[in-house]
Amino acid sequence: MEIKYTGMELKLHRHGIRTALASVFGAMLIATPFVGDSALANGIVTGKVFWFHLSMALMAIGTVVTAWPGGRKSIPFALPDGLLLLFAGITLATYDWQLDPEPEKLLFGGQLVVLWFLLRYFLTEAPCLKFFFLFVLMLTGLVEAVWGMQQLHGYAYSNHSLFRLTGSFFNPGPYCGYLAVVLPVCLWTALRFQKGMHYFGWVCAGAILIVLPAGMSRSAWMAAVVACGWVYWTERIGWEKTKAVCRRYKNATIPFIAIVAILVGCT
């Protein structure tokens, strides 16, 4: 039986395929921290690296296949795009090509640049994916936090003989760093949205806050405090309220800024 599509139906069909592929490949990328392969040398690390390469390749192929036919929305060039390209250009210009000390990191950085523009394309074509990616990212943070709690209480094994808390990573450093990255996202979601995403954001943030201090990573603590402070300032305070407070307490503003700068420098 032959199935015929009208122009609008064909367009919706292609849009659905594009959205489904973006959802699958995006979820694969976000789930990279959970990947490990015991058949590889240092499989906890190399497994994640190979999985990221595979996910990026599939995402790029899926983008080419779905973007080739039909019309597409125009993606405006924004300031972050220019800053990212400028940073990539400076990195390439200052890299020691003769010595070539970090080819793997150079490849990884190039893939991140490509990933940025792939996400720009997919989120422009299907804005609903923003909520899906947010949910999956926060879910990974919640799973990592629960995983860490199980390791602390002896219900799960750690991946390092010297550390009790590693999550799905090899040591506490990247584990705490990942939690510090996901935490401000959870806080932003809890402050920005209502109902389901609001409560889920607070649950994820609370779970991360419980386990993050046990990682004993001061850099992760500082990153989490600064990022969460910035998120709260943008969502609840803003520049206008800040200027009003500075004008009201102008005699104490400069000493306060100086003390904060000294404390940050000492740490």
Which residue ranges define each predicted feature?
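Alpha-helix initiation/capping motif
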Residues: 36, 45, 77-78, 194-196
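Short, Lys/Arg-rich, polar N-terminal cytosolic tail immediately upstream
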Residues: 1-15
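Interfacial transmembrane-helix boundary/kink motif in multi-pass membrane proteins
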Residues: 74-83
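Short, hydrophobic transmembrane alpha-helix segments
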Residues: 35-49, 68-73
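Alpha-helical transmembrane segments of multi-pass inner-membrane proteins
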Residues: 13, 17-35, 53-65, 85-96, ...
